[in-house]
């Protein structure tokens, strides 16, 4: 299977990690919750963890690749004050200013 479409997700935060099993059918996410999040990967999408904080979703169908990437991102969307969470690689997060004293 040749992959035409790619979607890179970046995990930002101390202790936040991603990994896959040997077949690449399950994505494990450690996002600061008390439990590990397991996501079943759809058969038409392949998922690779290039680094513990970089996820690559590939596939032939653009809609399915971006749909799975959106599901992964919805597990921990970027925070507006510190920017921690899961974001697309080329996404720009506009941070809010904190309280002024």
UniProtKB/Swiss-Prot annotation:
- The domain of life for this entry's organism is Eukaryota
Q: Keywords for this entry? A: Mitochondrion, Ribonucleoprotein, Ribosomal protein
Which Pfam families does this entry report, sorted A to Z? Ribosomal_L6
Listed GO MF terms: rRNA binding; structural constituent of ribosome
Q: Provide the GO biological process annotations.
A: translation
**GO terms for CC?**
mitochondrion; ribonucleoprotein complex; ribosome
Cellular compartments annotated = Mitochondrion
Q: Chief subcellular site?
A: mitochondrion
Q: Tell me the protein family, please.
A: Belongs to the universal ribosomal protein uL6 family.
Which named protein is this? Large ribosomal subunit protein uL6m
UniProt organism field: Marchantia polymorpha
Organism lineage string: Eukaryota, Viridiplantae, Streptophyta, Embryophyta, Marchantiophyta
Q: Which gene encodes it?
A: RPL6
